[in-house]
């Protein structure tokens, strides 16, 4: 493996570790780039080059995965509580994000999982 490939792999692995630990609070690419001491542009380019997906796609996919898990398993939590658990400022922002990503409102997704 070439030096640049090793560096890119290291950057992705460090990003993924940060993402798993911080996805609830941090949704911005700039935050992850700063933690890795990289410019957002360079950071985004490395992530896309090594994975074929943008850093934003990775962040969104992790958020959606965990949102679906909470909607499916935590019936004691309403949509607003799930929104706050995932770091959204309000349920409207979360609902818009969820629908943009999945095509369904969170309540529709939850209802579809229980029928």
Model regions: which residues?
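Short hydrophobic/aromatic patch on the recognition helix
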Residues: 43, 93-94, 98
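…primarily DNA-binding HTH/wHTH and HhH modules…
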Residues: 96-115
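Core residues of bacterial helix-turn-helix
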Residues: 36, 86-87, 98
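An amphipathic alpha-helical interaction segment
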Residues: 1-2, 38
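Residues within helix-turn-helix
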Residues: 30, 41, 77-81, 91-92
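Terminal helix-turn-helix DNA-binding modules in bacterial transcription factors
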Residues: 50-89, 111-115
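N-terminal positioning helix adjacent to the helix-turn-helix/winged-helix DNA-binding module
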Residues: 4-15, 51, 59-63
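Basic, amphipathic alpha-helical hairpins
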Residues: 1, 15-28, 47, 51, ...
């Amino acid at each position: 493996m070439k030096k640049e490939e090793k560096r890119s792999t290291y950057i992705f692995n460090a990003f993924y570790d940060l993402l798993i630990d911080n996805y609830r609070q941090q949704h911005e690419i700039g935050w992850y780039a700063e933690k890795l001491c990289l410019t957002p542009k360079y950071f985004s380019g490395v992530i896309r080059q090594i994975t074929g997906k943008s850093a934003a796609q990775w962040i969104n996919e992790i958020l959606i995965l965990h949102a679906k898990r909470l909607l499916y398993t935590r019936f004691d939590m309403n949509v607003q509580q799930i929104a706050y658990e995932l770091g959204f400022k309000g349920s409207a922002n979360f609902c818009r994000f969820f629908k943009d990503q999945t095509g369904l409102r969170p309540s529709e997704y939850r209802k579809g999982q229980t029928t």
